[in-house]
Amino acid sequence: LNYGIFLDNSYQSDFNFGASNDRFSSFGAHGGEMDYYFFYHSKLADIINSYTFLTGRMELPPLWSLGYQQNRYSYYPETEVFRIAQTLREKKIPADGITLDIHYMDAYKLFTWNKNRFPNPAAMNKKLKDMGFRTTVIVDPGIKIEEGYGAYERGIKDDIFIKYPDGKNYAGEVW
């Protein structure tokens, strides 16, 4: 018997497909609506097709993103990034991406580049792409509190930061 069940419920759910008794199966949720869908087909591929027809089919990610990504804390300056990329190519180690950690930033401010370590990010990225690499930069969910820093100033102006119950902007440590 080939079937699939989709329980459309955000509450804690329990599924028992023969764990305690191989003649008994059950599923349920601790609240909410019991909206469920039952799929039956002779082929597993058809069950998955019916399920994704209902829930949607995601786009495939770019092929390069599924390949090996060279990453560590942290590659800098730009010459070190190129050295790593060249070494991977010389040793014929397959790699599709290189990730830059926090040291690419200017004083750890998101959406900025440290121009001493990475004087021309666009040219660096082009050269890496010509070598067959895609560049990914780390983006942490924190905006540095610093007068004159564009992202911080815009956040204050547009009043978009998370607030404490007393209305003051939330501040926390990222690193």
What are these regions (language model features)?
Residues 1-95, 122-135, 139-140:
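Carbohydrate-recognition beta-sandwich/jelly-roll modules
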